[in-house]
Amino acid sequence: MKIFLSISSLLCCLSFAQAQNTNITLNSDLNLNCKFEKVILKNPEHNFESFTKDQIKRKDINKLIIESKTPDVLNVKNLSEFFNKIDLEVKISNKDIFLIQAFDKERNYSESAVYTRKTGELIHEITTNIKQEEKEKDISFYSCKNNNKDT
């Protein structure tokens, strides 16, 4: 009986945790072209220094696909190789934003992204060396336009 209660409690906790990390309230199908604007770097050489597109070379994102379907589907394609091949831990999509986050198996690397529908701004953050005292961050900012005029 104790084992049954323990397993039931664990499943309830996992379900609650999953519900907190997934909140899809809007179906959408976005096809975005995003122009790189600036990056903020935190690493041994730079302490949260900002660089514009004129100061550092970064690629634009062509054909960023965001598909969401209630209650729990959120797919993002072409943002990064990491996002293309991993399951998302955080999936939020509503009338204002979409937010995603994922970690590698060792939980020492993560990527997250926030897209604001109203402004078209996309922020893509990469964090490395999470388990170490000196984490490194690469935070890129993009200006996006939706190619699907009807969404």
What are these model-predicted stretches?
Residues 1-22:
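Classical Sec-dependent N-terminal signal peptides that target proteins to the secretory pathway
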Residues 60, 85-86, 106-112, 123, ...:
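Short, surface-exposed coil-to-beta transition loops
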Residues 69-115:
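Contiguous, well-ordered beta-strand patches that form the walls/edges
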Residues 126-151:
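Edge beta-strand at a domain terminus
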Residues 113-128:
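Extended soluble regions of mature proteins
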Residues 29-74, 109-115:
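Short, solvent-exposed loop/hinge segments that bridge or flank secondary-structure elements
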Residues 10-11, 32, 142:
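Secreted/extracellular small peptides and ectodomain modules produced from precursors
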Residues 24-33, 73-74, 93-101, 120-123:
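Short, hydrophobic/aromatic-rich segments at coil-to-beta transitions
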